[in-house]
Amino acid sequence: MAQEPILTARGLVKRYGRVTALDRADFDLYPGEILAVIGDNGAGKSSMIKAISGAVTPDEGEIRLEGKPIQFRSPMEARQAGIETVYQNLALSPALSIADNMFLGREIRKPGIMGKWFRSLDRAAMEKQARAKLSELGLMTIQNINQAVETLSGGQRQGVAVARAAAFGSKVVIMDEPTAALGVKESRRVLELILDVRRRGLPIVLISHNMPHVFEVADRIHIHRLGRRLCVINPKDYTMSDAVAFMTGAKEPPREAIAA
């Protein structure tokens, strides 16, 4: 591709005792694209995503964001750098309101002495910004911004998590199995949300086992096998059967896909 990648990894190694989860793994994410990451169970894709999102520190290798070497020691550092992750378990607090969940860990304090010394939250500002972010993604069918997340449907909860990531992910959004355990209708809405986020210019890393969803929204598909990137394919040029065959080792990918 003519553009320079916004996020790259080279030679990542991660060991857990005698198990090598990442074996000199490479990764490239380009501006404005949806890159799907697929692989069989135990292929190491989760470890790779954890490495680029700050959840684990690689034993070897280098990660670069916008061309600059980075080393995250925690997910918080990754978030501060502009990389947001929507986890499979959503990482939402069910008892808290939608607005509180949107700003969880990033609460807005009141100006002046009330915020500085008494740590009072500026709930009006948080509610206003949360409402604006949900509206941007067409999610204001949720009537009450102060209702508890536990009262929402699965698709609505996923929408809140996606809206939070889109609101604060200034450079990259990572989505881990965003349609898992959702019905057909709710999955459709989440896929539309993913495309909405992409239209806003944010590149997305999509981890999913749902091949129809992957082939519907991805611009490129990164296939991970035996701890490393096996190949990168364009979903317009290959079938789902091809992808599964590459992923399981039943079929060798073409040379140009391996070099991608």
Swiss-Prot record:
Residues 7-251 form the ABC transporter domain. ATP binds at residues 39-46. Keywords: ATP-binding, Cell inner membrane, Cell membrane, Membrane, Nucleotide-binding, Sugar transport, Translocase, Transport. The keyword Methyltransferase does not apply. Transmembrane segments: none annotated. It catalyses: D-fructose(out) + ATP + H2O = D-fructose(in) + ADP + phosphate + H(+). It is a peripheral membrane protein. One of its GO terms (cellular component) is plasma membrane. GO terms for molecular function: ATP binding; ATP hydrolysis activity. It is an enzyme of class 7 (translocase). It is found in: Cell inner membrane. Its EC number is 7.5.2.-. The keyword Membrane applies. The complex is composed of two ATP-binding proteins (FrcA), two transmembrane proteins (FrcC) and a solute-binding protein (FrcB). Belongs to the ABC transporter superfamily. Part of the high-affinity ABC transporter complex FrcBCA involved in fructose uptake. Is also a high-affinity transporter for ribose and mannose. Responsible for energy coupling to the transport system. This is Fructose import ATP-binding protein FrcA. It comes from Rhizobium meliloti (Ensifer meliloti). The lineage of its organism: Bacteria, Pseudomonadati, Pseudomonadota, Alphaproteobacteria, Hyphomicrobiales.
